[in-house]
From Swiss-Prot:
Protein name as annotated: Large ribosomal subunit protein uL13
Function, in words: This protein is one of the early assembly proteins of the 50S ribosomal subunit, although it is not seen to bind rRNA by itself. It is important during the early stages of 50S assembly.
Swiss-Prot/TrEMBL keywords: Ribonucleoprotein, Ribosomal protein
Organism: Helicobacter hepaticus (strain ATCC 51449 / 3B1)
Intrachain S-S bonds: none
InterPro entries: Ribosomal_uL13, Ribosomal_uL13_bac-type, Ribosomal_uL13_CS, Ribosomal_uL13_sf
Superkingdom of origin: Bacteria
tRNA-binding keyword on record: no
Cross-referenced SUPFAM superfamilies: Ribosomal protein L13
Amino acid sequence: MELTKIATQNDINRQWIVLDAKDKVFGRLITEIATLLRGKHKPCFTPHIDCGDFVVIINATEVKFTGMKLKDKEYFTHSGYFGSTKSKTLQEMLEKTPEKLYHLAVRGMLPKNKLGRAMLKKLKVYRGSEHPHSAQVAKSSK
């Protein structure tokens, strides 16, 4: 009788995946990114092991949003001091810090523990089409 094989950290073979965000719907792109980071697209997926791939997002500012989200959706921050609540619209976040916008959206779809934080570190977001990971991407595609 053979037992089910459970993947260990040594069995994981990570790839570098480049996704172009140009003209893609933001929410659907984020779910795809979360699936790749978690490793659920692999047959060797194990919930307690970080078996996801590295994901590089290019053209992060050219993503599409449905509805009136660019004007209506707000992100709030609070430092802990009285009266320090600050808000930014989605349009402001996309112009100033698209990297933070992607990290916040993906973080909500990953586990809320050490494993989720390790998965989030494998996400690389860039505004334009240039990225410094071309050596890793070329090596993993072979």
